[in-house]
């Protein structure tokens, strides 16, 4: 873990200089978290783990009867590799259905029943301990406003069931005020969730998204507004800021209800710019890079 220059490999050679430990940083402690699918390339995982404090394994789900759904492919190997590097694995529970979409109906079926809520909390705590996790990461989206307190109750109950030393992360929609309307925001009470959780993750990304108009994924002015509001409700020591490492490729002109952007990693974006000989520019407003390119389509025309 103290030698990220090894690139995740465990082989060392005579003459190499290794770091046994670091002196205390004059800047204080830095904590990081990353999300991982169980099918991640293992070499990429090993290269990344030295930089992570926590690793949220994506993801467990649940059915309407409260039974948990394990992540596709299993989590045993991911947990084991994370521990090799001293990274704490987190059991991520989402409100994603078996079809792969976030469901407010699924959330409602859980949080409307105190009995079911207690059952899921108990199953979460038991699974986290048995599987070797070091905590739980809750990622419930599109919570109807009337179940905001029920969500907080789930977090509080989970706190009483997890062993000492385990942590609870809760992901928060990017709100800028307590009164912000919309299904994505109304079920997330920043103050109450911040008090109940050990840490929160601000989802400061996805302003630009697959079906929306061309926008920066995380424009700086909007990100700042979310952080400033979060700081008014939650201690700064509990806040993790979400940072995207991807972008989107839109075909222009954008047509609402029809256009669908393709996601691509930062490296893929750089590669695409090189292939198209596109000039990478910088938006002073969003404080983010972008580029345009032209491509001949199958009908013999050109698209931007």
Descriptions of predicted regions:
Residues 95-107, 247-304:
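Glycan-binding loop/region signatures in secreted carbohydrate-active enzymes
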Residues 17, 37-39, 60, 94-96, ...:
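Active-site beta-loop-alpha junctions enriched in small/polar residues
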Residues 23-120:
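Glycan-recognition patch characteristic of GH18 chitinases/ENGases
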Residues 45, 64-70, 106-114, 140-148, ...:
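Second-shell loop/turn segments in exported
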Residues 2-29:
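Extracellular LysM carbohydrate-binding repeats and other cell-envelope/extracellular binding modules
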Residues 56-59, 119-150, 199-213:
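Active-site groove signature of glycoside hydrolases
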Residues 64-74, 147-276:
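Substrate-binding surface in catalytic domains of secreted glycosidases
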Residues 32-34, 53-57, 87-93, 136-138, ...:
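Hydrophobic faces of well-ordered beta-strands that scaffold small-molecule active sites
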